[in-house]
Design a protein with these regions (language model features):
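TRAFAC-class small GTPase G-domain
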Residues: 1-197
Length: 197
């Protein structure tokens, strides 16, 4: 029962080993916020596991995922992703999830006009409590037929301009722009952390 100087030359079969090209030197915390049913969990699952399900259960409180994000410069960021429930009765608890967040994806459903209106609450809440948090407005469900869409790009752009946010239109169902959202926000997290280091 001693220590051996030899080490296995490769991991056991079936075991995945994720070796980053550069040492992981940064961690980031990202939170998804928005009304219930806008697709926050679907966005997170599409990004982390590349899956989509029409029958996701409603998130109660919050959920946690983690992803290693490969950046353009070859470095990596360990991103902790907090997926929150959108029910109004849980809003007081959600501060536990977004405390010390580096970034927030404030998400709305393009087929539900009220869901964009309600994003203003989250912007104001984060600016009040997490003033250095990077904010990204995410329009979800852009795969729907045009006649079902209640919020056009121009209206969303006006919202983004008013609050100085990053903006993406996405579809968790098709995967459109999902990776771009996380890659862009991760780059911004790294830039912010490097400026404060």
């Amino acid at each position: 029962m001693g220590c051996s100087n030899s080490s296995p030359s490769k991991p056991p079969e079936g075991l995945k080993v994720n070796t980053p090209s550069k040492v992981l030197n940064l961690d980031g915390k990202l939170v998804l916020l928005g009304d219930s049913g806008v697709g926050k969990s679907s966005i997170a699952m599409r990004y982390v596991n590349n899956v989509f399900s029409e029958s996701f259960e409603v998130t109660i409180g919050g959920g946690y995922l983690q992803q290693i994000v490969r950046l353009k410069d070859g470095s990596s960021l360990k991103l902790d992703i907090w997926d929150t429930g959108g029910q109004e009765r849980y809003r007081a608890l959600l501060q536990l999830y977004y405390r010390d967040a580096d970034a927030a994806l404030i998400t709305y459903d393009v087929t539900n006009a009220r869901s964009l209106e309600n994003c203003e609450y989250w912007v104001n809440e984060l600016r009040r409590t997490e003033e250095n948090c990077i904010l990204c407005l995410v329009a979800n469900k852009i795969d729907v037929p045009a006649e079902e869409r209640k919020i056009d790009s121009k209206t969303a752009q006006e919202f983004v301009d008013k609050f100085g946010m990053i903006f993406f239109e996405t579809s968790a169902k098709t995967g459109e722009n999902i990776n771009k959202v996380f890659e862009t926000v991760s780059q911004e997290i790294v830039k912010k952390k490097n400026q404060t280091a």
